[in-house]
Amino acid sequence: RATEKSVKTNGPLKQKQTTFSAKKVTEKTVKAKSSVPASDDNYPEIEKFFPFNPLDFESFDLPEEHQIAHLPLNGVPLMVLREERELEQLLHLGPPSPLNMPSPPWESDVLQSPSSILSTL
């Protein structure tokens, strides 16, 4: 019976202690919230220092004068350049001419006989 009495007396005391500590916690959070300074009022010049527009960094479109959607590009092969040197050679070729054009490596010589073509494969 002594254990029953101690349990009965300890039960309400524990409840009072938990509510008391909960009040302390809420008081601490209220104090913490009131002590935080408002960021907009104290530092307005910082936001003007670095102008930032996130839309500037998310635009992947070409300007209107460089749009290529209206061009018929069906059948145009994709050019994959292995080195920067090949790109520089393409840029410095000038206007295309059938006499000066080097033959692409994927085209075979038209004058070759079929047997020589098969032997190279």
From Swiss-Prot:
Originating gene: PTTG1
Motif TEK-box 1 positions after renumbering to this chain: 3-5
GO CC terms: cytoplasm; nucleus
Assigned protein family: Belongs to the securin family.
Subcellular location: Cytoplasm; Nucleus
Compositionally biased region (Polar residues): 110-121
Assembly, per entry: Interacts with the caspase-like ESPL1, and prevents its protease activity probably by covering its active site. Interacts with p53/TP53 and blocks its activity probably by blocking its binding to DNA. Interacts with the Ku 70 kDa subunit of ds-DNA kinase. Interacts with PTTG1IP. Interacts with RPS10 and DNAJA1.
Domain of life: Eukaryota
Domain note: The N-terminal destruction box (D-box) acts as a recognition signal for degradation via the ubiquitin-proteasome pathway.
Biased composition (Pro residues): 95-105
Motif window: TEK-box 2: 26-28
Record keywords: Cell cycle, Cell division, Chromosome partition, Cytoplasm, DNA damage, DNA repair, Mitosis, Nucleus, Phosphoprotein, Proto-oncogene, Repeat, SH3-binding, Ubl conjugation
Protein name: Securin
Main location group: cytoplasm
Modified residues (Phosphoserine): 97
